[in-house]
Amino acid sequence: MTKNFINRLDQDLSNLKVSHLHREVRLYKDFEYNLASNDYFQLRFHPKVIAGAREACEKYGSGSGASPLLSGFLPCHKELLDEILNWKQKPFGMLFNSGFVANQAILKHLPGKKDFVLADRLIHHSLAQALLRCPAKFKRYSHLDMDELENLLQKNNDNFDTIFVVTESVFSMDGDYPNLKKLVALKNKYPF
């Protein structure tokens, strides 16, 4: 690495610290509940989950070894997908290895150039990142403001092929949630 490169990195790090944007990895050892994770109740430590993982590792190895499209879609993946589709009574679906990957894949590619996305202002950052990379135009509405959302739907209803509305079932930072009855009523009134 060149001296200029190292100096720039040092300056960038200093700027992050001054602006209180510097982050460090912290070691977390023991906790019964972790509401800052994707595993609130520590289910990954449940004996049945551990036994299932052990059995899968013995049968399939410690990973799929490839992406699903190449050779990484294993019988255990098909069984899981079939079970979910049966439970949800859906004809098809996809598996993703994380919520982040699902958000990126779906929102980056599903809305097209002639579509419009309306997103709650406080959607997860991974959703917002995906919307910045998708070909559709998007606009954010005020957090949980169903009246503003309805105004935007009414105003843009005939201007795009498809309108997508992006919100969350529970907003992870505050624990609040959208008025689902109102959202369903808007869905029935406007085709999105």
Model regions and ranges:
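Short, structured coil segments at secondary-structure junctions
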Residues: 113, 133-135, 190
